[in-house]
Amino acid sequence: MKPVLFELFGLKIYGYGAMIALGILAAVILLDKRSKKRGYNEDHIFNMAIVGIIGGILGGKLLYIIVDIKNIIDNPEILKDLGNGFVIYGAIIGGAISVYLYCKKKNWDVLKMLDLVVPSVALAQGFGRIGCFLAGCCYGKPTKLPIGVMFTNSPFAPSNIHLHPTQIYSSIFDFLLAFFLLWYSRKAEKSGRVFSLYVIIYGVGRVIVEFLRGDPRGNVSMLSTSQFISLFTIIIGIFVFNIDRFRKQ
């Protein structure tokens, strides 16, 4: 764990923020490169990326407030720390809605654009999870496996206990998913296939990793909030993947 990477002219550069920024930069560069090959205007793509990022930030914060509303009501000062509290599924949903609205404004094919965007999203998530590891948040359950990691003086993870490095599991998974989507996008013939595979595969992976998470978070019955949302995203993904078949029926 390394919450503060280094200091520059007295300014602390935090690992979590640095990885988020690096992930966004990598995602935008990848999106710009791929969109040019498909004839999209660079300025329009950049504007859409900004709108999507803003929507993602707002969505991530909003879902955090919804999930942790009881604790926030008891301790409203939590909201004063703008860097605290963020739910990735809220960011995905908020970003997707923003991209959808922008596509409608530009009369773009929504599914084609989502196909173009999701590899960049997965790439950004991979960097973001490294940031989680550096900060010590989103930690795993105790483990006796050699792969277990120990945090010291973390404001989030318990100290001096070997824990599953769920942040690293998620990061590796996200990077592999990004590369798979890039590969599949070259052979996908129908709009929506890349996007649908993203929400299906990410949903399945998230359900699995959540079983290893040890940090406190919201739940719906026996499932964590993210597992509950994942069930719906998987269903949506399956529907979109087979949308042509449903239309014919």
Curated annotation (Swiss-Prot):
Pathway, per record: Protein modification; lipoprotein biosynthesis (diacylglyceryl transfer)
Membrane topology: Multi-pass membrane protein
Entry's Gene Ontology BP terms: lipoprotein biosynthetic process
Pfam families (UniProt xref): LGT
TM region(s), chain numbering: 11-31, 49-69, 82-102, 116-136, 163-183, 192-212, 223-243
GO CC annotations on file: plasma membrane
InterPro entries (alphabetical): Lgt
Keywords linked to the UniProt accession: Cell membrane, Membrane, Transferase, Transmembrane, Transmembrane helix
Record EC number: 2.5.1.145
Cellular compartments annotated: Cell membrane
A GO MF term: phosphatidylglycerol-prolipoprotein diacylglyceryl transferase activity
Principal location class: membrane
Ligand binding (a 1,2-diacyl-sn-glycero-3-phospho-(1'-sn-glycerol)): R129
Annotated function: Catalyzes the transfer of the diacylglyceryl group from phosphatidylglycerol to the sulfhydryl group of the N-terminal cysteine of a prolipoprotein, the first step in the formation of mature lipoproteins.
PANTHER family, per the entry: PHOSPHATIDYLGLYCEROL--PROLIPOPROTEIN DIACYLGLYCERYL TRANSFERASE, PROLIPOPROTEIN DIACYLGLYCERYL TRANSFERASE
Homology family: Belongs to the Lgt family.
Name assigned to this protein: Phosphatidylglycerol--prolipoprotein diacylglyceryl transferase
Lineage of origin: Bacteria, Bacillati, Bacillota, Clostridia, Eubacteriales
